[in-house]
Amino acid sequence: MQKKFHNSYLAHFLLFNFFFLAYSLFSTLISVYMQDLGYSNAQVSMVVSASFFASMLAQPIFGVLSDALGIKKVFLFSFLAMMVGAVFFMKATQLWQLLVWYSLVLMLVNGVNPVMDVLAAQSPYTYGKIRIWGTIGYALGSQLAGLIYQRVAPQAIFPVFIGMMLISSIGLLGIQPKHDRA
């Protein structure tokens, strides 16, 4: 079974669909979530802006790390750190905590995001057949975030994010990027 999963379409589907679904879950309703915690629009804007700034700084670093250490190693560490960051974000109540943990998670997500396209291009399948699952996952994540927020609880989004990242990690384990360091 493991040999059939190695570089399979299923492995790529799991990686792309659930990574982007998780990304959407985590980020889609951040402003609503923070406003429900009592933060002003300016405070929400500060948290979101800080995350984009951290992401901008991280992207070139992720490229260098992926080249030096290997995509899979960098991704596995990043996925684990995203899940840990989500736990801390879920428990955060102070503005500085929300800023730090949201920025960390989004920095990691946006750091690996461009390298995801490398994985899609290197897969044994056409780029579009792999990348479409990221688009579908993101769209599903936006809708799912709203449903979870409204029907379960706002903080329930974060354990679901962690679950989706675990599924994405299973997909990552089934992929062997070309020219990756072992």
Describe every region a protein language model picked out.
Residues 17, 85, 95-112:
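Hydrophobic core of transmembrane alpha-helices in multi-pass small-molecule transporters
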Residues 156-174:
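Symmetry-related core transmembrane helices of the 12-TM Major Facilitator Superfamily/SLC fold
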Residues 2-52:
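Helix-loop boundary and gating motifs at the non-cytosolic
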Residues 38, 70, 91-96:
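Helix-breaking motifs and short loop linkers at transmembrane-helix boundaries and internal kinks
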Residues 52-60, 138-139, 143:
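Residue-level signature of mid-helix packing/kink "hotspots" within the transmembrane helices
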Residues 109-124:
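Intracellular juxtamembrane helix-capping segments at the cytosolic ends
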Residues 73-88:
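Structural signature of the two symmetry-related core transmembrane helices
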Residues 57-70, 149:
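Helix-to-loop junctions at the C-terminal end of transmembrane segments
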